[in-house]
Amino acid sequence: MKNTILVFVLLIVAIITGCSSSEASIETNEKVEITEDEVMPNNIIQGVMRDISPKEFVLDMGSGWNLGNTLDTEDVDVTAWGNPLTTKAMIDEIANMGFKTLRLPVTWQYHTGSAPEYLLETDWLNTVENIANFALSNDMYVIINIHHDDEWIVPTYENAPLVKDRLTKAWTQIANKFKPYGDYVIFETLNEPRHEGSPEEWEGGTAEGRDVVNQYHQVSVDAIRATGGNNAVRKIMVSTYAAGTGENVLQDYIVPNNDEDVIVSIHSYSPYLFSLAGTDPTWGTDEDKAQLTQEFNTIQNKFESEGRAVVMGEWGSTFSDNENDRLAHAEYYANLCAERGICPIWWDNGNADEFGIFNRNTLEWVYPEIAEAIVNATK
């Protein structure tokens, strides 16, 4: 059956980035009718695992879009940060624009039982699966991760034993849930693993922090692989410390078991003042382009030499009454990714005054030119 719900969308003011917990949806004062689709069948995609290299795989992922501020809310309510419930119609529109990959950020701690079992709620696993199937039914790749669980995933030697135990149990359950699915389902062990609130949080962390993050990735990959079946060879994205691109972060990054099916996951809101802080609304000079190109050259030099495929799991720019500059930045950024075989996945938090380029209430593109530029780069 289909249930029809009336959604009254109010003006909400908040501040959001891909890493914050204060959220908002796209502004509108319309009364919009949204159809809540029936649960998708879980057999819509055959469990095919292709014999394809990670680099070929990432090229086939094309360009991607993040369903931000929904399943990753730091609350039991997925609408707590202002976005509506996710419908198949939303994901259909993302696919119709030409995006081939959906990154599905998921926060698990509000849907997890107590120690020592740390059982994940069945209904929550089913919710994640249902939205994943929205993407899969459109022949899209879908990335499922552990996102805003930083409260308990603290990278210190003191915390490591308990965290590793819980990560092992979480990923065992997630991996078993999706084991029958083919390789269009991708796992991402951790979003931006870091010591939240520490002085070095966004500066590459400490040697201890980087070491422990590597350990957390290790147990996560081991847990996924141990479930067997399709998960024995499934592509897994593994992030650097805080998903950063700094010198110390890249230097200390370790691929668990030198696993050939691990894909590097990084994020870069560059340049910071334009993309994230929103205090410099202009972009596009030769110097701007040279600085961004240099960052991508550093990424390429590191991972090309190691034969690793790379996904840019989050990037974007905030709105500061500067649509032309944002378009120029998006075109240049997405093409830098495409030239290096990197899949660019735009961070969309649902807020048109920040990173939102798609209105999930009206199912319309607020900034279609930006979306088209991202998609066209990887065609």
Regions found by a protein language model. Give the residues of each.
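Active-site region of glycoside hydrolase catalytic domains
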Residues: 165-280, 285-288, 295-317, 339-340
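Acidic/histidine-rich helix-loop elements
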Residues: 67-86, 114-120, 159, 273-292, ...
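An active-site-proximal structural segment forming one wall of the substrate-binding cleft
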Residues: 45, 82-102, 116-148, 152-189, ...
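N-terminal carbohydrate-binding accessory modules
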Residues: 27-101, 373, 377
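Substrate-binding cleft of secreted/luminal carbohydrate-active enzymes
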Residues: 289, 293-367
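Short, acidic/polar
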Residues: 77-96, 167-169, 292-299, 326-331
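C-terminal motif of bacterial Sec signal peptides marking the signal peptidase cleavage site
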Residues: 15-18
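Catalytic domains of carbohydrate-active enzymes, especially glycoside hydrolases
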Residues: 85-107, 296-303, 336, 340-343
